[in-house]
Design a protein with these regions (language model features):
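N-terminal leader segment of winged-helix/HTH proteins
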Residues: 1-19, 65, 156-163
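N-terminal helix-turn-helix DNA-binding core of bacterial DNA-binding proteins
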Residues: 13-54
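Basic, amphipathic "hinge/linker" alpha-helix immediately C-terminal to the N-terminal HTH DNA-binding motif
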Residues: 23, 75-97
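Canonical helix-turn-helix DNA-binding module
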Residues: 45-73
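Short aromatic/hydrophobic contact patches that present stacked aromatics
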Residues: 47, 83-85, 117
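Alpha-helical linker/hinge and terminal dimerization helices associated
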Residues: 65, 96-107
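Short polar/acidic secondary-structure junctions
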Residues: 73-76, 123
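C-terminal regulatory/oligomerization modules of transcriptional regulators
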Residues: 102-163
Length: 163
């Protein structure tokens, strides 16, 4: 019988961890609206057309994860309500949303084209998400990438190999 080769444990995965957080229905759309400046609970519910109980759960998850902060406000003569703002960790998801949007624009938009376009507010140029290595080489989506263990990797032994 041969030795037991080590394999990376795929249960410890940054993609899986991130999808646990943002992969729930409505979560990406809530984040989209927060990026676009919709902050108040009632406005989010109306803009998204989402059930209030679902929105409450999604926002609570985002607050608990540190992606969003919740702040009370009160209009004169009204009861206290809440508004939500992205944290630095929440803002770090912007490239993810833009990449999802770019995929939809390229592969799912109707014949008339994308419904919205993003422009850099300072110069008016279109906003894109690029895949590149640390040396600045631009990569296309089919570029070969090597997967190697990172500092947080865990290993498991694979099944014994018969001779």
């Amino acid at each position: 019988m041969a030795t037991h080769p080590r394999e990376l444990d795929s249960t410890v995965c940054s993609i899986a961890r991130t999808m646990e957080l943002i992969g729930q229905p409505w979560t990406m759309l809530v984040l989209r609206d927060l990026f676009n400046g919709v902050r108040r609970f009632d406005e989010l519910a109306e803009h998204l057309g989402i059930a209030r109980n679902v929105l409450t759960r999604r926002l609570a998850t985002l607050v608990d994860a540190g992606l969003v902060t919740r702040r009370s406000y009160r209009e004169p003569g009204q009861r206290a309500r809440h508004e939500y703002r992205l944290t630095q960790a929440g803002h770090a998801l912007r490239p993810v949303l833009i990449a999802v949007m770019a995929y939809g624009d390229e592969h799912l938009a109707g014949p008339e084209g994308p419904p919205v376009q993003l422009e850099h507010a300072d110069c008016g140029a279109p906003v894109t998400v690029r895949l590149e290595c640390a040396e600045g080489h631009r990569l296309d989506p089919t570029a070969r990438l090597r997967v190697r263990p990172g500092p947080g990797a865990r290993f498991r032994w694979s099944e014994p190999v018969s001779d």
